[in-house]
From Swiss-Prot:
Record's subcellular location: Mitochondrion inner membrane
Organism of derivation: Xenopus tropicalis
Record note on domains: The twin CX3C motif contains 4 conserved Cys residues that form 2 disulfide bonds in the mitochondrial intermembrane space. However, during the transit of TIMM10 from cytoplasm into mitochondrion, the Cys residues probably coordinate zinc, thereby preventing folding and allowing its transfer across mitochondrial outer membrane.
GO MF: metal ion binding
Membrane topology: Peripheral membrane protein
Principal subcellular localization: mitochondrion
Protein name: Mitochondrial import inner membrane translocase subunit Tim10
Length: 90
């Protein structure tokens, strides 16, 4: 595959993944923090604080999971490299 096309595809996938994460986060936090029947047009103080905390936690967990998955991926790559070296040296 052409490197430019691969880079473009990776960028498109990243945008799609970020949009998916945003949609899940807003849906989950809205469901948790905002009652289904609105009393007022504006968010209450409690709803606003709840949404702020929910989004903060969601983003924190997303970042932690990304770091852990990267770490595991690097470990897998290292293991595969060692296995290939072991096979090629015999």
């Amino acid at each position: 595959m052409d490197p430019l096309k691969a880079q473009q595809l990776a960028a498109e996938l990243e945008v799609e993944m970020m949009a998916d994460m945003y949609n899940r986060m807003t849906g989950a936090c809205h469901k948790k923090c905002v009652p289904p029947h609105y009393k007022e047009a504006e968010l209450s103080k409690g709803e606003s604080v709840c949404l702020d905390r929910c989004v903060s936690k969601y983003l924190d967990i997303h970042e932690r999971m990304g770091k852990k998955l990267t770490e595991l991926s690097l470990q897998d790559e290292e293991l595969m490299r060692k296995m290939q070296q072991g096979v090629s040296s015999t």
